């Protein structure tokens, strides 16, 4: 990260002390940078940062890491528990390893990158931004996704894109089953360009043309008595 980096050893310190250090460091300058050592899978690290900060976390983190953040660049050298980068507004959050359930849940902007696999309900209720998973993603990935882009380099579980409203899901591997009102669509030139840029940012070596595009069938937008069976399945 360069000179002027502030380092904090988490061993023996409370979560409140760690997050207070991050908040104070972020206030020092627009180019503030910090390193956390020995996080030991602690929950709720780097939550609620709304001032620009470049943060490197050396080790695994627990639940809700980097949630409710804005204008941050958080990089975790390890795995993350569930709720990674929940409700991210802007910036970038990445983990080199895998993430638990609901990675990127309700995110509104920015980029979330999971180098390994992601658990169930990855990208649930996304409202914007880009979520990239290098490996596999669990069941109900993209559930109730409203906006944004979700890219999976591996396979996905059942009910992919269930009750998808808007947004786009791209899957390179096998899709176990699509969810209610999720359909496969043809890739366009714009999709290829989008995928190429997102894959490059995530350092993923994959051909954009190898991905399948999943979008909303838009049959759940409005209730129609003629389609009550579709609604029964969705609910």
Named regions from a protein language model:
Residues 1-45, 139-140, 146-235:
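Intrinsically disordered, low-complexity terminal regions
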Residues 32-34, 43-45, 51-53, 63-65, ...:
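The right-handed parallel beta-helix/beta-solenoid scaffold, focusing on the short coil/turn
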Residues 64, 102, 121, 159:
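Residues that form or flank phosphate/diphosphate-binding pockets in enzymes
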Residues 37-39, 58-60, 67-68, 77-79, ...:
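Feature marks extracellular polysaccharide-active and adherence modules
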Residues 1-4, 40-42, 53, 66, ...:
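Extracellular/periplasmic carbohydrate-active domains that bind, remodel
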